[in-house]
């Protein structure tokens, strides 16, 4: 059984259809990416999974349980963490306070304090900034903070939407290293990433989404000529 199963999902914003029957799966501990042009429906699909946008038809299941009709915070409590596009920090709160909010559904006790210590071990720069307000952090540090905050819920699955957006190349590369390390430690990841080249290299499998439809799925999509031409600017050998 897949950890996450999406089947023939359609969704709209008013009269505008955004998804036209998207299907995908994420297995336990798997890193899967979605690539496609802006407006293809990738972010909308993540919002459907999290209950932020209702599905018109189709099914979304997590560990065999339907997510359709569930409230977002109830979905999060099942073990799904969503890191949306952009800097989602609470800028006037400290790094420590932001991280504690990530465990909002859990009792603050020795276990959650231990989880905080383990999360901070992954992000040593946040230890140095622990009492700073989040709004004073650099863009890369803020992105690390929102991922760290999501980890405080101890998720089985993370939905990451454009985690490298707006980051300098070296910081983006560090972000990809963090994502790989999280996945290697057992956290499943569904990744939407503007840098299709990096995303397809990181992921075990990938999906191409066009105009709200799943048009291609498989391993080694970075070797597919159609994907190369559409999203990677031609042969990787030329890079």
Locate predicted features.
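Conserved beta-strand-loop-alpha-helix hinge in the C-terminal portion
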Residues: 213-233
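The feature captures the beta-strand-to-loop junction immediately N-terminal to the Walker
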Residues: 35-37
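ABC ATPase C-loop
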Residues: 150-151
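Helix-to-loop junction immediately C-terminal to a conserved catalytic motif
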Residues: 50
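ABC-type ATPase nucleotide-binding domains, specifically the catalytic core motifs of the NBD
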Residues: 14, 70, 95-114, 122-124, ...
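Conserved ABC transporter NBD signature motif
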Residues: 58-66, 78, 111-116, 216-218
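Conserved ABC ATPase signature
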Residues: 133-137, 141
């Amino acid at each position: 059984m897949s950890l996450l199963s999406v089947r023939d999902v359609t969704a709209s914003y008013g009269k505008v259809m955004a998804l036209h029957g998207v299907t995908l799966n994420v297995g336990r501990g798997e890193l899967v990416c979605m690539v496609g042009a802006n407006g293809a429906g990738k972010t909308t699909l993540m919002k459907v999974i999290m209950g932020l946008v209702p599905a018109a038809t189709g099914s979304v299941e997590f560990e065999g349980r339907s997510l359709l009709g569930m409230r977002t915070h109830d979905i999060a409590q099942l073990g799904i963490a969503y890191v949306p596009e952009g800097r989602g920090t609470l800028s006037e709160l400290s790094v420590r306070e932001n991280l504690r909010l990530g465990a909002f559904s859990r009792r603050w006790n020795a276990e959650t304090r231990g989880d905080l210590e383990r999360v901070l071990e992954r992000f040593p720069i946040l230890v140095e900034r622990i009492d700073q307000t989040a709004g004073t952090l650099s863009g890369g540090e803020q992105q690390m903070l929102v991922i760290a905050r999501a980890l405080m819920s101890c998720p089985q699955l993370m939905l990451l939407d454009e985690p490298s957006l707006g980051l300098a190349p070296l910081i983006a590369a560090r972000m990809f290293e963090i994502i790989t390390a999280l996945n290697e430690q057992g956290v499943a990841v569904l990744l939407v990433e503007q840098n299709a080249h990096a995303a397809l290299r990181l992921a075990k499998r990938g999906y191409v989404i066009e105009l709200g439809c799943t048009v291609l799925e498989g391993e080694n999509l970075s070797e597919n000529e159609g994907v190369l031409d559409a999203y990677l600017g031609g042969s990787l050998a030329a890079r």
